[in-house]
Amino acid sequence: MVKGSLLNRNINALNCRCLAQKLTSWGLLNIRSIHADSNRGVVNSSNLIIIPPYKPKSKSVLRSPYLTSHYVDALAFKLVEDPTVHNTLEDVFQDIESYKPKSVNTSAKSFRQLVNTLEVAFRKEQLRKFAKVFHIKSSSLRKKEIIERILLDHWKLRIHGDAMDDMLAIKDVTLCPLEMFFLLLNNASALRDISQKHAAHVVINVTNNNIKIEAKKRDVAIVEELISGIFKHLKSKTIDVTEYYANIINKNAVLLSERCKAYIELSGKAQIKITTAFGNCSFDEIERKLLSFVMLFENTDKCLIDSECLTSKKSFTLNDFTYDFRLPWYLKDDSWKRWCRVKEYSWNTSVLSDEALTRNSLTLPVPIKPSINKDISSIEVKDLSQKNTTQSKKLNSYIRDSFHSVNDFWFSSHATNTEQCFTKRLTATFGYSLFSSSFLSHTKNPDVASFYVKERSKAHHFLFNTFVDQIPSYLKNHSILDETTRKSFYRIILSSNSLSTSLTYPLIEIILPIKNGFLMGKETFQIAFKKSRGYQILLPESELDLKINTTTFKTIANNKSVDAFLDDCVSFFSRPEMTQDSQLNASSGFLTNFSLKDSTDRFYKVLSYEKVSERFVKIDDSYITYSDIFSPLSHSHKDWFRIHTEENSSKNFYEIISEIVGGFPYYSQANERSLIS
């Protein structure tokens, strides 16, 4: 039997439990030492992962025919060593009753099974006893012949291989870093099952990529083959990126490998090699994840927040506004307060639509104070979508060169749905923050920001919003207090007190427009909706139950499009007996346009929806169109705006903005003042 010799060594038992149960955060930390920048040759007990063999919790003997091998071997050994026994099975069977535990079933079938099991064990024990004698008195060749004769003729047993297969054997297997990475990442539970099935100790040494297998001699080769079979389906692909991106990826290859579930490494000056075990995700999905993560690296100017190391939820109040976020691993204790205060950063929580990130909230620092320099002509942009990032242009020149004659496009600070929503990714140097400081996530230089642009199709009549897989708990309820803006503003949002996961009927808040100079009111209603897999559904696949009071109730089916669904909701809330305002029925066409992602395991995508107000201003041969929209992800109203220019304009883009609105005033989170002066 396998002896627990390795367990007697001074090895961290917590590490054993970690990997034996499931690959947890501790296992992910060990993956980091696999990359090339790790220290080699130093064997630390914390770098050893022990997967012990399976041992039954109960020490009592199991009922026959499921007798433990421990009991059978011990009983046979006792019978062989007993001087009163004449080494014959007849004598053994006569004494079975005296040795058999009371807990063993004494039925005829169970007794017969016990006799057969004991017979084999007894023969093996006698064989071991004979082998000791032959080892002393005979040569190895003579011993082998005698053992084979005993087994084949006298004991009626046929063997396959060495007769000493039950002896303990140790095998060292050396893996490459790539194989060790996938072994720890995806196959810890499989390795645990292998060790339990074959009663083998498996010791993983992360320091030198070595695996030690301690098991019965006949099982060592089997365990080694099963472990090697894990790496038969590895595939690799090389992608071309810019040198700027390659540098970011190379510096953060370990964290990116963990998050993308693939081995990421630099293969050239501007090439990245991706190795994956197919079955998890395709190369295209990994590339999309990698791009999203790199954007986060660039925006935060910090290492990517490790989801496995996120600790308790924190909150603090700044400028009369309360921020909730999860403390990342690089801010320990209370140092995050000092860090925020020194950097004048607020914590603006944002979520990417990438599947790998929906479980956690990522924190993006956003400067509180805007830039003061009003030299609008100093705005320059660089196209980060192209490999050559050295050339920069004035924003107005870039607009004309990239989008040609009549231009209609969107800006956004969010990196969500990059392939669907954005065609260009830009960085701009702002002498004057056209988009306001709360609009963009800055890095080291508060006057330099990255944003995303998409050429807008004429067929699109509404804005896009951000899609997420879950309703985030940090969503806030904001109100625009300016009456002028509210006159044309109609929105349906989730109220802030409706976000607890324990609530079955979250609230919907209706902001009614102003009529004849008076605010008609703000009403709060309840939505009753179905639940699926423990998540609240905002837009279910089948139907939505709308409830205003205990007596007013309506079910709206979602069997057409999202637009039709929203129109039904608006018409239900806009009935004359409710609002006394016929204008609300016509306002449903101004709701934001959404499209759900096709998925079999998710049932809702829309985070919030609201009406937007559009303003048109024309000067000479040019005109500008801009829209006010509220995005709860960044606590900023001006997360999207639209600019429309014509090529034969007698004034440039900056002169138009300066002359009409004097630049966009920044949005103060302290008092939520008006967006447009």
UniProtKB/Swiss-Prot annotation:
Pfam family, any one: SLS1_N
Major localization class: mitochondrion
Ranges in coiled-coil conformation: none
Domain of life: Eukaryota
Annotated GO MF terms: translation regulator activity
Location in the cell: Mitochondrion inner membrane
InterPro entries found in the cross-reference section: SLS1_C, Sls1_KH-1, SLS1_N
Range of the transit peptide: 1-41
Any GO CC annotation of this UniProt entry: mitochondrial inner membrane
Transmembrane segments annotated in the record for this chain: none
Effect of a null allele: Decreases protein level of mitochondrial translation factor mtf2. Protein cox1 absent. Abolishes growth on the respiratory carbon source glycerol.
This protein's UniProt keywords: Membrane, Mitochondrion, Mitochondrion inner membrane, Protein biosynthesis, Transit peptide
One of the GO BP terms on file: mitochondrial translation
Its job: Translation activation factor that as part of the MRH5C complex specifically recruits cox1 mRNA to the mitochondrial ribosome for translation initiation.
The family this protein is said to belong to: Belongs to the SLS1 family.
Subunit and interaction comment: Component of the MRH5C complex, composed of mrh5, ppr4, mtf2, and sls1. Proteins mtf2 and sls1 form a subcomplex that serves as a scaffold to bring mrh5 and ppr4 together. The MRH5C complex associates with the small subunit of the mitochondrial ribosome.
Protein name: Mitochondrial translation factor sls1
Originating organism: Schizosaccharomyces pombe (strain 972 / ATCC 24843)
UniProt lineage: Eukaryota, Fungi, Dikarya, Ascomycota, Taphrinomycotina
